[in-house]
């Protein structure tokens, strides 16, 4: 099968650039091309292709074709619309969409970890997006197989990663890390999603707890695994999304009118209403607030 290169996609990468391309049959793909002949970069690119080629999960990028030995080294992958960098602003305060996107990311991360793969460069730019239910973790160039005897290109003391998303232990030594380093990065990504890149406060204490636990500077105090992390995320978001029907909303507003809700419940209800409710329900909610409650919410 022949492939034809079209336009460059996004910003230049570290060792490779990504372009739109199409096959001789007219199908659209993306192609990542190595742009240097540096020996270490070539070895890392070849390792990325070998590792990615053996993975098979809808939330991890797949390789369709490749050439890592010729003069022009490349691999072909599915074409995605964008990374989640462009989508995150649209997710703010929309808990349904947040949960869908977060679930996709975590499913991919769980798969990588259970295959014994550390990503080590997880960030929004490396998470590709077609829809809220079609998301893939990409760019496994810095990934490593846990407990593998294969060639290791990271030497003791080497450091790589992106400043905001790199764990403290990886900032010291990128070789001596485990799956907790990816959990740290996910915590920062979750914070990006719920705050629109830190423009707004974290919406509630439960999400704040998850972020804090993911990003604890001590790796052994983070979630024990990405699967344990997902279980906590599921519990928190499913609880946040319970109030969706008009009957539930009416019941909650009635409790508020009777003074039977504490402020944390009021705050959570407000967030749920902003994501799910019709304008008349939101109006009833604000009319039911006392002056003090309104001022507290306004301050928040």
Feature map (PLM): residue ranges:
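AlphaC helix of the eukaryotic protein kinase fold
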Residues: 35, 39-54
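Short beta-strand micro-motifs within the conserved protein kinase catalytic domain, predominantly
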Residues: 62-73
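AlphaC helix of the protein kinase catalytic domain
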Residues: 84-94
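Activation segment signature within eukaryotic-like protein kinase domains
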Residues: 101-102
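Catalytic-loop of the protein kinase fold
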Residues: 113-130
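Conserved activation segment of eukaryotic-like protein kinases, specifically the C-terminal portion
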Residues: 153-170
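Regulatory extensions appended to serine/threonine kinase catalytic cores
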Residues: 241-300
């Amino acid at each position: 099968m022949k492939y034809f290169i079209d336009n460059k996609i996004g910003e230049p990468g570290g060792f490779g650039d990504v372009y739109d391309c199409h096959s001789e049959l007219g199908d659209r793909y993306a192609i990542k091309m190595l742009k240097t002949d540096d020996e270490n970069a070539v070895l890392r690119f070849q390792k990325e292709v070998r590792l990615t080629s053996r993975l098979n999960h809808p939330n991890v990028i797949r390789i369709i074709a490749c050439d890592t030995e010729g003069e022009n080294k490349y691999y072909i992958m599915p074409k995605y619309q964008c990374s989640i960098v462009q989508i995150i602003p649209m997710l703010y305060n929309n808990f349904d969409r947040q949960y869908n996107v977060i679930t996709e990311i975590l499913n991919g991360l769980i798969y990588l970890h259970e295959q014994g793969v550390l990503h080590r460069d997880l960030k929004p730019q490396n998470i590709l997006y077609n829809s809220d239910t079609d998301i893939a973790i990409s760019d496994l160039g810095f990934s490593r197989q846990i407990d593998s005897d294969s060639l290791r290109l990271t030497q003791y003391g080497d450091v790589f990663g992106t400043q905001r998303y790199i764990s403290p232990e990886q900032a010291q030594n990128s070789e001596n890390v485990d799956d907790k380093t990816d959990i740290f990065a996910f915590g920062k990504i979750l914070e990006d999603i719920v705050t629109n890149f830190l423009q707004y406060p974290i919406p509630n204490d439960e999400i704040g707890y998850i972020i804090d636990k993911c990003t604890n500077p001590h790796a052994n105090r983070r979630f024990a695994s990405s699967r344990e992390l997902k279980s906590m995320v599921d519990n928190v978001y499913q609880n946040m999304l319970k109030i969706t029907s008009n009957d539930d909303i009416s019941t909650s507003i009635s409790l508020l009118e009777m003074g039977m809700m504490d402020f944390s419940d009021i705050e959570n209800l407000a967030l749920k209403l902003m994501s799910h409710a019709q304008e008349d329900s939101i109006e009833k909610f604000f009319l039911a607030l006392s002056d003090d409650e309104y001022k507290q919410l306004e301050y928040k």
